[in-house]
């Protein structure tokens, strides 16, 4: 089987809910990171075989959003494209599929990642096609219904955090302190310029004058344990989940270029990382947020590694509580895990986050000269995805 390598890794800064990127559609954001990923890889556009992009909230975008993004990126019409929805794992699964295509010889060059504009997700009227004979009609929120809601158990993902927190005995105080650390780490990373190499600045059109350049993640903010502890429970009375210790609804996109090592060497591309083992795992949907507890050991077993042999982990912070539960169960070193903050502070554009955490992981591995990293995310449906990358 051929070796799959990553030769570029880029993301937009993440915009807050109804924030800086709210007016730029997901396919536009996707087009920007695809174009930049190909440019940074120094790969001719005609050498790209396929584009795979995650998108969880596609309502209103039209046919094959990945193709739209590829065309906006300036790629040729003949490039094959498809859009994947594996909820929060979409963009990492896109990279996993790209690696499989390269490893099996089906492709030499694949652009993979994800894109999401949660701010722009529309509302829709489910029975409008057939009419309402009598009684009230309900307008659905595409973002909540299709992105954040467990249809089987009929509850918001925040309720899963309540259940996981109870099961793993993660207190409100522990969650708030973890959230504070995530914000502090993200702000420190921004101040030190650690995200600059991975971020593609985005020009935001203004009503008058020149576009405004958006180049810094919008969501990280100064806070304190006192401020976090005063926030009310968001999902159930007396609950432990708040707006302060949950991931931030946000907008953004990320992409990587995956190639065969042979093609990368032929074109003189700089190899940023080699793709190792990949894994998925499914559990009881009620406890979806802690599924990485099983996905991470599975991927490490496939790679022949122990937890303590991994230099860096990126575990997506859907909620502080569930992240604490995963770290507790796997005995992860906090100094190796989400070292620049995570989705609690940076934001969680659900269709893009899988690649966002990978992009951040790769750039931090380069900065530290780390040899092995693992990215993992829980995802709606009671599953998690995990990927090993090596340098």
Model features per residue range: what roles?
Residues 1-26, 139, 224-290, 294, ...:
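Condensing-enzyme catalytic core mediating Claisen C-C bond formation in acyl metabolism
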Residues 1-61, 65-73, 77-80, 160-172, ...:
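Conserved active-site "lid/cap" helical segment
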Residues 11-12, 23-32, 40, 174-266, ...:
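N-terminal extracellular/periplasmic Venus flytrap/periplasmic-binding protein-like
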Residues 55-109, 152-156, 222-248, 329-356, ...:
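Conserved catalytic cysteine-centered active-site region
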Residues 84-116, 165-194, 255-262, 349-370, ...:
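Active-site-proximal alpha-helical scaffold in enzymes
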Residues 109-163:
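Flexible glycine-/small-residue-enriched beta->alpha junction loops
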Residues 160-162, 195-198, 206, 276-345:
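Active-site pocket-lining segment
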């Amino acid at each position: 089987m051929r070796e799959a390598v990553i030769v570029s890794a880029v993301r937009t800064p993440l915009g807050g809910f109804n924030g800086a990127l709210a007016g730029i559609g997901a396919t536009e954001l996707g087009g920007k990171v695809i174009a930049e990923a190909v440019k940074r890889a120094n790969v001719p556009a005609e050498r790209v075989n396929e584009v795979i992009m995650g998108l969880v909230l596609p309502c209103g975008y039209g046919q094959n959003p990945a193709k739209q993004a590829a065309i906006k990126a300036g790629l040729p019409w003949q490039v094959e494209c498809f859009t994947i929805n594996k909820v929060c794992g979409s963009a990492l699964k896109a990279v996993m599929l790209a690696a499989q295509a390269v490893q099996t010889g089906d492709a030499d060059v694949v652009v993979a990642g994800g894109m999401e504009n949660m701010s722009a997700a529309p509302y829709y009227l489910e029975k409008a096609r057939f009419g309402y004979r009598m009684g009230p009609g309900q307008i659905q929120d595409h973002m909540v219904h299709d992105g954040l809601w467990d249809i089987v158990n009929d509850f918001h993902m925040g309720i899963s955090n309540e259940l996981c927190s109870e099961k793993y005995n993660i207190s409100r105080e522990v969650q708030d302190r973890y959230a504070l650390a995530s914000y502090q780490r993200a702000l420190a990373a921004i101040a030190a310029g650690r995200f600059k190499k991975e971020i593609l600045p985005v020009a935001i059109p203004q009503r008058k004058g020149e576009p405004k350049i958006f180049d810094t993640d919008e969501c990280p903010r100064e806070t304190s344990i006192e401020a976090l502890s005063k926030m009310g429970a968001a999902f159930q009375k007396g609950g432990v989940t708040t707006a302060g210790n949950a991931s931030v609804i946000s907008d953004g996109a990320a992409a990587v270029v995956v190639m065969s090592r042979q093609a990368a060497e032929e074109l003189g591309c700089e190899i940023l990382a080699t793709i190792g083992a990949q894994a998925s795992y499914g559990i009881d949907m009620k406890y979806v947020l802690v599924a990485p507890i099983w996905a991470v050991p599975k991927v490490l077993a496939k790679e022949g590694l122990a937890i303590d042999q991994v230099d860096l982990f990126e575990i997506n912070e859907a909620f502080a509580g569930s992240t604490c539960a995963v770290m507790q169960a796997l005995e992860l070193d906090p100094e190796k895990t989400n070292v620049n903050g995570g989705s609690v502070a940076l934001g969680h554009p659900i269709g893009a986050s899988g690649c966002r955490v990978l992009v951040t992981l790769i750039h931090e591995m380069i900065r530290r000269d780390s040899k092995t990293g693992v990215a993992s995310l829980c995802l709606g449906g009671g599953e998690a995805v995990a990927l090993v990358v090596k340098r």
